[in-house]
């Protein structure tokens, strides 16, 4: 393929972009030409994978959850997803809203009522339609949508965010394998990994669009008598895609973020309504009891393969869920990484695991228990019949038994549409990240993927290929599980090095810079109290003093046969010492705006003025000290101090 693309294609990675499009086109050709044969083949392969590799899925997902708990509880959790000085890009409310809506918001609308009722009617073990079956139904539902699902997303998201923001690698799936294959991520290996992730994202969103419009169509039929047909569903896909395109056009902050926040608010309104209109005390009691049973049985359920009572249930439920979450993890993990810069690893893991799981438990607990209450205590068996005939109408049938059912069903329909829009626009943004050369790609690229997903969903809906596509996605989860295990291995290696460096810096015996400083104490105090108020003053210092110090020490390093480079940055200057196959040493002096301490200068001046400082940055980020007005000798001594710490760290790594 050509290495340079003129015009519109100037910002695409041609190998990933065109490779993805060609494979999708070939897949469509096969499905359109022989849909029945292809569906039969994929169903047989899916069944073989389920029968032969259930144990592998169960062990892998258990490992991901245990790994995250270990990382969060260890000293590794203090490491930031970005330089040490970085701060979260989004507040907690916006962050959670985007996690929730991109991860599984639409699934909660579809299965919030349907899955507990399904397990109540057909439990994995024991007698159906009993109190024990009701308790087991909620416990299993929590299990499928709780910690394990978010652990899968969190492993991919953590690996991508760590290598992208901590080590300045591209925010692409390939970067998570850097510790294992090194610079090969920039070649065919890396392109292949990104193509795989891109195809999974496109197929996953297209499948959700195709199946999801059936629920929207069901809601419109239930509310307004709109015909349930393929033509109506095609129009709905076009409508959802237009809304998604508008959100994509507005971008992450103005489009996806605001839409996610609106989704969360509307979902909370629906949840509160169900709680108030339903049996409130019963919902509180049962949800709390279900949560306790979920937690107390978590370890047993994690490793339960039903090996002594094989009935096919685990393959149709737990293994299907694990495979589905894994197949979606490149998309959701990438999106989580994109919105999580600046958070500590502990904050990331706790947030991604516990907050969505907690909301899921409340959602499933309230809606599921309210539905079971109407079946068990109010004998509303029509809900069972509705779920068995068409699970997509379960939510609307359930709301029909509550007050204000018309208004709430309209709200539910709007929520379903908005959740699909957020899934589609998030998928388009992620796909664009994977196929573009830089993050700042032209709008047409993001819109292209939105349109492609819609076209793919429409074609598969018309030829009846959605089931085959769903089976193909689930099949793709098996090789990607292996990729995730390698990701985890590489992540552990890199995190271990990061912690080792933190310990090396603390343990290194370095002579304090003040001992080298020949100034009097009066001169040193004057420097401490000096607060420049113009960025030009700091930049002038960097261009003169820092540049000369860097040139002098570069000369000495090169005399000792080390490769050294000096780079002029937009806001400062960087010195880099190459160590080839080992971690390079980086020392930067950067002009940064900060708040002047009001106890040293007049409060009015502190509040009104701007204070810039010349801050030292290492590979790990800002070091929180100012070198403004240091002499060249002071700077060189500090560089040597930091370089000595770096060598101490490398010695520990070697040993």
Each model region followed by its residue ranges:
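N-terminal alpha-helical transmembrane segments of multi-pass membrane transport
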Residues: 1-133
């Amino acid at each position: 393929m050509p290495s340079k693309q003129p015009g519109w294609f100037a910002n695409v990675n041609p190998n990933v972009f065109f490779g993805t499009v060609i494979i999708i086109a070939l897949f469509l050709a096969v499905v359109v030409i022989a849909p029945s044969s292809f569906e039969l083949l994929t169903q047989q392969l899916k069944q073989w994978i389920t029968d032969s590799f259930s144990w592998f899925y169960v062990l892998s997902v258990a490992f991901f959850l245990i790994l995250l708990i270990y990382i969060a509880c260890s000293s590794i959790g203090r490491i930031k997803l970005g330089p040490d000085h970085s701060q979260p890009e989004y507040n907690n409310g916006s962050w959670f809203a985007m996690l929730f809506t991109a991860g599984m918001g639409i699934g909660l609308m579809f299965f919030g009522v349907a899955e507990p009722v399904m397990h109540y009617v057909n439990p994995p073990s024991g007698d159906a339609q009993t109190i024990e079956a009701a308790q087991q139904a909620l416990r299993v539902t929590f299990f499928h949508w709780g910690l394990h699902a978010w652990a899968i997303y969190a492993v991919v998201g953590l690996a991508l965010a760590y290598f992208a923001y901590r080590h300045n690698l591209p925010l692409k799936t390939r970067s998570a394998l850097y510790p294992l294959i090194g610079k090969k991520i920039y070649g065919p290996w890396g392109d292949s990994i990104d193509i795989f992730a891109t195809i999974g994202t496109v197929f996953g969103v297209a499948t959700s669009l195709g199946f999801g419009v059936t629920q929207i169509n069901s809601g419109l039929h239930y509310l307004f008598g709109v015909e349930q047909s393929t033509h109506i569903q095609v129009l709905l896909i076009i409508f959802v895609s237009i809304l998604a395109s508008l959100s994509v056009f507005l971008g992450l902050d103005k489009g996806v973020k605001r839409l996610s926040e609106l989704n969360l608010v509307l979902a909370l309104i629906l949840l509160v309504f169900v709680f108030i209109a339903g049996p409130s005390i019963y919902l509180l009691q049962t949800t709390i009891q279900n949560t306790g049973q979920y937690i107390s049985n978590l370890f047993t359920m994690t490793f339960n393969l039903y090996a002594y009572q094989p009935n096919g249930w685990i393959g149709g439920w737990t293994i299907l869920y694990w495979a589905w979450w894994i197949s979606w993890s490149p998309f959701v993990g990438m999106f989580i990484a994109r919105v999580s810069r600046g958070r500590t690893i502990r904050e990331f893991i706790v947030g991604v695991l516990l907050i969505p799981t907690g909301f899921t438990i409340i959602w499933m607990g309230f809606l599921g228990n309210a539905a079971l209450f109407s079946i068990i205590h109010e004998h509303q068996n029509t809900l069972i019949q509705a779920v068995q005939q068409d699970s997509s109408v379960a939510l609307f049938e359930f709301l029909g038994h509550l007050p204000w059912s018309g208004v709430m069903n309209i709200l539910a329909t709007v929520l379903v549409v908005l959740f699909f829009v957020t899934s589609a626009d998030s998928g388009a943004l992620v796909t664009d990240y994977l196929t573009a050369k830089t993050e700042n790609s032209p709008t047409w690229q993001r819109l292209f993927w939105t349109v492609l997903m819609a076209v793919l969903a429409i074609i598969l809906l018309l030829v009846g290929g959605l089931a085959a596509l769903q089976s193909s996605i689930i099949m793709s989860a098996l090789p990607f599980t292996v990729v995730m295990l390698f990701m985890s291995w590489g992540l552990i290696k890199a995190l271990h090095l990061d912690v080792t460096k933190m310990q090396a810096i603390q343990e290194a015996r370095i002579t304090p810079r003040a001992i080298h400083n020949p100034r009097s104490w009066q001169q040193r105090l004057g420097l401490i109290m000096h607060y420049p108020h113009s960025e030009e003053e700091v930049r002038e210092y960097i261009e003169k003093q820092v540049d000369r110090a860097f040139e002098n020490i570069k000369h000495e390093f090169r005399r000792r046969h080390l490769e050294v480079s000096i780079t002029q940055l937009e806001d400062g200057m960087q010195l880099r010492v190459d160590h080839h196959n080992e971690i390079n040493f980086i020392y930067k002096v950067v002009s940064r705006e900060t708040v002047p301490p009001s106890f040293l200068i007049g409060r009015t001046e502190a509040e009104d003025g701007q204070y810039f400082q010349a801050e030292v940055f290492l590979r790990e980020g800002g070091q929180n000290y100012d070198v403004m007005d240091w002499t060249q000798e002071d700077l060189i001594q500090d560089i040597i101090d930091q370089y000595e710490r770096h060598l101490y760290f490398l010695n520990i790594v070697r040993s």
